[in-house]
Amino acid sequence: MKKVLVINGPNLNLLGIREKNIYGSVSYEDVLKSISRKAQELGFEVEFFQSNHEGEIIDKIHRAYFEKVDAIIINPGAYTHYSYAIHDAIKAVNIPTIEVHISNIHAREEFRHKSVIAPACTGQISGFGIKSYIIALYALKEILD
């Protein structure tokens, strides 16, 4: 069974609480349950990690290599726009990685339009609500099969 690591960055633990008009009203826990169900259907083992701290996210990406993780789905939150360190960590481990965003980052404030992480990733999915994670799972199924 292929193992997928889902990493969520800053403030994503507040899904269902923060800016419901942008991120929806589904709780973080319910998002994880939805991802788990779909991952199981697709034959993936899934592990979740959330941190509001850049260094912890980088450490987790490094550990993914040594733990033989097959793929990563990452929602870097605001780190999307300036974390060259997360970009470099993804490049370093050479694990298929998909960057996801709940909102369409290109339809929001100007500073959110650029991702410095996407160039290190296999692809980017943005703007489909929590379904962005599910779409990423389908993409990984194609990539890993």
Swiss-Prot record:
Catalytic activity: 3-dehydroquinate = 3-dehydroshikimate + H2O
EC number: 4.2.1.10
Active site: 23, 101
Signal peptide: none
UniProtKB keywords: Amino-acid biosynthesis, Aromatic amino acid biosynthesis, Lyase
Binding sites annotated in the UniProt record for substrate: 75, 81, 88, 102-103, 112
Pathway: Metabolic intermediate biosynthesis; chorismate biosynthesis; chorismate from D-erythrose 4-phosphate and phosphoenolpyruvate: step 3/7
GO molecular function: 3-dehydroquinate dehydratase activity
GO biological process terms on file: amino acid biosynthetic process; aromatic amino acid family biosynthetic process; chorismate biosynthetic process; quinate catabolic process
Site feature Transition state stabilizer, where: 18
Annotated CDD domains: DHQase_II
InterPro entries in the record: DHquinase_II, DHquinase_II_CS, DHquinase_II_sf
Subunit structure and binding partners: Homododecamer.
Function noted in UniProt: Catalyzes a trans-dehydration via an enolate intermediate.
NCBIfam families according to UniProt: aroQ, PRK05395.1-2, PRK05395.1-3, PRK05395.1-4
Family, per entry: Belongs to the type-II 3-dehydroquinase family.
Name of protein: 3-dehydroquinate dehydratase
Organism of this sequence: Caldicellulosiruptor bescii (strain ATCC BAA-1888 / DSM 6725 / KCTC 15123 / Z-1320) (Anaerocellum thermophilum)
